[in-house]
Amino acid sequence: TAALIEIDRPPVNAINHDIRAGLVAALAAIAGDNEVERIILAGAGDIFAAGADAGEFGLPMVSPDLPAVVAALESAPVPVIAASRGACLGGGLELALACRWRIAAPTAQLGLPEVILGVVPGSGGTQRLPRLVGMKAALSLIPEGRSIRTAEALQIGLIDQQDDDPVAAALAVPRADLDARQPVSELPAP
């Protein structure tokens, strides 16, 4: 059985306190279900998550913060698969980097553009991205806040698959492939 967790905060699925708390609560609820063998993390509509809610910038952080959500995804009792359409940016990409497998629709856009706003990716993206794609590719993205399309993301190893229907594709990933994958944070540093 698969569990689907959807980020649903139109128009761009910006990650705010309610989304962070909802993700942690959903993961905790699923942890007690022995029938679930994979979790699919997707965005409602045509966007995965366009990053943190800029309306919360400068406000005191309310728990759980995004690093706690990333840690919960990465330590989930079953593999989590990111199924992205549209924007998978900033905190959205950091959520995807915490997943064991990443699938994107051909029109997806992936990156850590928050540096353009003077914000450093603060939820492990600067550590996980180089471990996954290598230092050269990571340095072509992070310092300039450059975003890339699915084809390039697949080429550099940021995603594992491209599919028109990422959620359906996530259901078809062989369990052995998921089990063989270690968390990105445990990959060797470049």
Regions found by a protein language model. Give the residues of each.
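STAS-typified acidic loop motif
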Residues: 1-21, 48
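Amphipathic alpha-helical segments at domain termini/boundaries
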Residues: 1-6, 50, 94, 98, ...
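Short beta-strand/loop segment at the start of cytosolic alpha/beta domains
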Residues: 1-9, 26, 31-40
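Terminal peptide-recognition signature
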Residues: 5, 22-23, 41, 53, ...
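Glycine- (often His-adjacent) and acidic-residue-rich active-site loop
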Residues: 35, 42-72, 88, 116-119
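Glycine-rich beta-to-alpha active-site loop
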Residues: 72-117, 121
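Hydrophobic, secondary-structure "cap" segments at the distal end of domains
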Residues: 126-136
